[in-house]
Design a protein with these regions (language model features):
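Conserved helicase/translocase P-loop NTPase motor core
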Residues: 37-53
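Short glycine-/small-residue-rich flexible loop motifs, especially phosphate/cofactor-binding loops
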Residues: 14, 47, 108
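Residue-level signature of catalytic and energy-coupling elements of molecular machines
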Residues: 13, 61, 77
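Hydrophobic residue at the +6 position relative to the catalytic HRD Asp in the kinase catalytic loop
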Residues: 63-67
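Short beta-strand micro-motifs within the conserved protein kinase catalytic domain, predominantly
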Residues: 1-9
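Conserved catalytic-loop position in the HRD/HxD motif
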Residues: 54, 59-61
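Helix-rich C-lobe and terminal helical cap/extension of kinase-like folds
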Residues: 7-8, 17-19, 24-41, 68-180
């Protein structure tokens, strides 16, 4: 509940909510179904607001969540919220579809809705390297243990490859809406 006399237009003060740190919950909880529920809730906490409302919490690190006993989430620190235009959100969704279906025309359309002006074939190829990495967990409709996911080293190597390829083609100026 908000505490009005301690809040301003720029500061929201609320009553205390109960919950434990994410890692504490994971270490304490033996029930695999409850852990899977937490994973699904964290997934939904990110994707549902973005895909349905065009809003993201711009600081989604583990310190900004506490977990209730039922694996429900308490989301903390709303200091970095970003609202996106519907065409940008539809571009994100269509880029996922383009990567999944290997549809280059749809990828071009998606990048244009993101704000990239006249993306070249080579630029699309390079950006799709990164997009494929980002969308990889969503491209297969199955439960995927974290141990099966690429390591942080793989992410770094992918980012380095994209950076190198972008330099080769003269760089790219990310559209304003693309940068948080």
């Amino acid at each position: 509940e908000p505490i009005n006399n301690l809040s301003t237009k720029r500061l929201l003060t609320m009553t205390k909510i109960t919950g434990m740190k994410v890692k504490e919950f994971i270490n304490k909880t033996k029930d695999k179904n409850l852990k899977n529920k937490l994973a699904l809730n964290m997934f939904k906490a990110w994707y549902v607001p973005f895909y349905e409302y065009g809003i993201i919490h711009g600081d989604p690190h583990l310190g900004n969540y506490t977990i209730r006993d039922d694996a429900g989430l308490n989301l903390l620190d709303f200091g970095c919220i970003r609202v996106f235009k519907p065409e940008f959100v539809s571009g994100v969704i269509d880029l996922y579809r383009a990567i999944r279906e290997k549809d280059n025309d749809l990828a071009v359309s998606a990048y244009k809705r993101w704000g990239f002006k006249n993306p070249t074939k080579k630029l699309i190829e390079v950006l799709n390297i990164w997009a494929t990495f980002v969308y990889q967990p969503l491209l297969e409709d199955k439960i995927k243990p974290i141990s099966e996911m690429p390591t942080g080293k793989y992410g770094r190597k992918t980012a380095e490859k994209v950076h190198k390829e972008l330099r080769k083609i003269g760089g790219v100026k990310p559209p304003r809406e693309f940068v948080l």
